[in-house]
C-alpha cells in the first residue's frame, strides 16, 4: 500500500499486487479520512510485453479471468498481512465501494475526476494548493 497519498508526493493512494508477469494496481484515490482526492481506478500491466507499463489491460476482455484472480490474491494478501482496513475505516469504505469497478463505480469516478480537475485548476491558477500534513491543512505557495 502506498500511504503517502496526495499529501507530499502528488501520487494517488493505491494498493497493488505483482507477479512475475503482471502488475495489478488499484488507485482508490482518497486520503486517510476517506475524502476523495483523485478518481478511483484499476490498472493491469503485462510486464513481459509492456515493461514500461504504458498499456492498461484492465478492461481487455481477454484478461478478465486474470483480473479476477489477481483481485482475489490481492484481497487474500491484504487479509494475511493485516491490512483489513480497521485502522482507517473511511479509507476501507472507499476501497470496498470501488472494488468491483462496475458501470456505476466508473460513472462516479468520472464525476470525481471532473471535480478534481476543477479544484486543481483553481489551485494552480491561484499559485497555491492545499497540502495536507499530519497536523492538518496548510497553504503552500509555488515560486513564480
Where are these predicted regions, by residue range?
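Residues at secondary-structure transition points
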Residues: 88-91, 133
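Phosphate-coordinating loops and pocket residues in cytosolic domains that bind phosphorylated ligands
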Residues: 59
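C-terminal cap/loop subdomain of S1 sulfatases and analogous C-terminal strand-loop tails that border
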Residues: 1-43, 47, 52, 65, ...
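Short amphipathic alpha-helical coiled-coil/interface segments
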Residues: 70-74
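Intrinsic low-complexity, glycine/proline- and repeat-rich
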Residues: 98-144
